[in-house]
Amino acid sequence: MLDCSNVSVVIVSFKSEEALSSLLPSIPLECETIIVNNDSPLPKKIKEIRNFSEILNSENKGFGSACNIGVKAARKDYVFIVNPDTVFENNTVAKLLELSEKMPEASAFTPKILNQNKTESFKRRSILLDKNKWLKTHPSKVSEIPVMGGAAIFIKKEIFVKLGGFDEKIFLYHEDDDLSLRLKNEIGPLIYCPDT
C-alpha cells in the first residue's frame, strides 16, 4: 500500500463532536487532518484524540464554503473531503490514492459508503442519479458514475482549486451535484471504488 502522507483529510463540522470522536481515530496518522468548524471551538476531549488543524468560521456559510476553506488550507497534493459521521476502514485512503495514481484521467473518486447497519448508502437528493436503478445495478467493480455525494470525495487539490471548488452560493444540498457535473465536463470521469 502507498504512503498516505500526501493526503489531507478535510472535515466540515457543525455540532459534530460525537461523530468526530469515532472518525478521528480511524484516519491514518500520516494524513494531514483539517476540521473546518461551522460552530463553536471543539472541546478538549476531541483535541486529545489526534493532531489536527481546526479552522473556526465566524459564521456558518454552509458546507461548500467550509470545504473550500479546508481545501485551501490543505498542504498535501490530494484531499479527501469527508462528512464527520464517517469512519474509515483499513486502507481506505491508501486504496483511493493507489487507484487515483493508476487512473490519472479521472477527475475524482468516491468509496463505497456503508450505513451503520452495513447496507450501502445512497446519495440522496440528486436528480442526476436514479435511486432504484443505482440500488439494482450499482457496480461491484471500479466504475465510472454520473455523480458523487459530498460525504466522501477524494480528489487532487490542484483539480479542486482549478475548478473553483464548491459553488458557495449553494449553502447545503446539491453542491455535490454541481461539482460532479463540472468535474465530468471539464476534467474527466468520476470513479466509484467499491473495495474501499
Q: Which residues fall in each region the model found?
A:
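Acidic metal-phosphate-binding loop of nucleotide-sugar-dependent transferases
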Residues: 40, 61, 85-87, 170
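Glycine-rich, basic loop-to-helix element that forms the pyrophosphate-binding segment
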Residues: 57-74
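Short aromatic/hydrophobic "clamp" motif used to bind/position activated sugar donors
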Residues: 79
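Catalytic beta-strand/loop signature of glycosyltransferases that borders the donor
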Residues: 187-196
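Short, well-formed alpha-helical segments that are part of the catalytic scaffolds
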Residues: 11-29
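Acidic donor-binding segment of Leloir-type glycosyltransferases
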Residues: 24-59
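Acidic/His-rich active-site region of diverse nucleotide-sugar glycosyltransferases
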Residues: 56, 68-69, 87-164, 169, ...
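Cell-envelope/extracellular polymer assembly enzymes that use nucleotide-activated donors
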Residues: 6-8, 32, 178
